[in-house]
Structures are given as structure tokens and as C-alpha cells.
């Protein structure tokens, strides 16, 4: 999850799942109903949606691990991917109860699950169906939340609004922030102290991590590779790998 704009939620979600798959079975799920892009990023066919398939299964009854794996695409021995909607205008295919059933099924299907969701409207939810339903359903059922923000003035400002909204939800789960695309050009000559001061003003107890601006990210995307996958190593992937290694003992 993360701020509006393009902070790099999908890129980091894919990289996190790839790093986790080195340790145990992992499912990567594209539940971004606004801009589903994992299939595009990894070079998968985009004419069928694993998420829609699972949502239809959920409407008929409980989802089994066999259903989950059957709706996924194998990326590597330990990494399976459930691709997102074929097109964003079909967001109604994934209801809030449906995504909650999917999240529950994921826990029985792999050791780790990484779910990429869209940024949400930071206003009170409407009574009817909403494009935010999938993201809200995931946020309500998640065991851990990773918030992605872009490392510039606009990104940190957006993070402050998101942090206030999240506090109002009163969810008691571990939350960490990844500040992505950090550079001295955008933050100043001392990025980490500057970020500590800025984020500490509205998230004083927050653990945050930094992933640097890196041209290697674009090169990996052009090749259909996840960060850190088969020759797609760069400074950004090394930073993300280090973050995941910190998490693994507590997952």
C-alpha cells in the first residue's frame, strides 16, 4: 500500500516477493484495482486475470489452496503470481467480501503472501460498492503493512495525510514505511537525517527504510525482471534485499 501518485508500490512489492521466495513458498498478488501492472512488469500475458478467477470462486464458496495455486502463474520454484484485473474498469469483479476470502485462502496456500494494492481515497468510505473495496479489504485482513512513499517533498507530504488516515482506522498491526527513490537531488545532501526529521514529525514511532534512486530499476523493468532477479541486481535491489532480510525472522 502507499501514497497516491507513483511511489513504486508495485516495483517494491514484486521485489519483496522475489526476495522472500529465496526463503520459502511465496504468493504475489496484484490486487490493485486502479492500475493492475504486475503482469506487465514481469512480462506475463495480460488476457486473463488470476484475481478475477479467485473472486468468482469466492462467490461460489470457500477457496482452497488448490484453487489459489490453480489461479496463479509460476514465476520460479517458490514464487507464484496471481495476476490482476485485465482492465481497471472491471473493478466490480472483486468485492470486499471476495478479497477478504482470498486473503484468508492465501494463508493456507504459501508461507508468505505479498499483496499489492492501490492507494485509497482518504475520506470516509461510501455505503455502496467502491473501487477502494479491494484495498480496504486487504488492509483489514493484513498481518503486516508496508507503506511506500516517494522520497521527495511531494511524497512525504502525501505520506503525512496517509499516516493520519491510517491512525484513524485503529488497526493494531506492524507498520513500516519504505521511502523509495531517495536521492540527494530530491531530499538534500543528507537524505536520511532529513527524512528522520520530516517523518518523525507525524509518525514519531515509525520504522522507515530507504531505497535509493537507481537507473537499474528501469533496466530491470525493461527486461521484465523483478528487482534482484536473475541479473537484475542494483543498488536499489540490494537495499530492498537488506530490508527483507531484517523482516524474515519475524514473519
Regions found by a protein language model. Give the residues of each.
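Inter-motif core of Ras-like GTPase G domains
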Residues: 108, 128-152
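Phosphate-binding loop that captures ATP/GTP phosphates
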Residues: 20-81, 103, 208
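Walker A (P-loop) phosphate-binding motif
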Residues: 1-29
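NTP-binding/hydrolysis catalytic cores, primarily Walker-type P-loop NTPases
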Residues: 222-251
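Conserved C-terminal guanine-recognition region of P-loop GTPase G domains, centered on the G4
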Residues: 135-136, 159-172
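Conserved Switch II/interswitch segment of TRAFAC-class P-loop GTPases
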Residues: 119-123, 142-160, 186-188
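Phosphate-binding/switch loop-helix module in NTP-utilizing enzymes
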Residues: 78-128, 135
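Beta-strand-loop-alpha "switch" segments that mediate conformational coupling across diverse proteins
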Residues: 181-183, 189-228
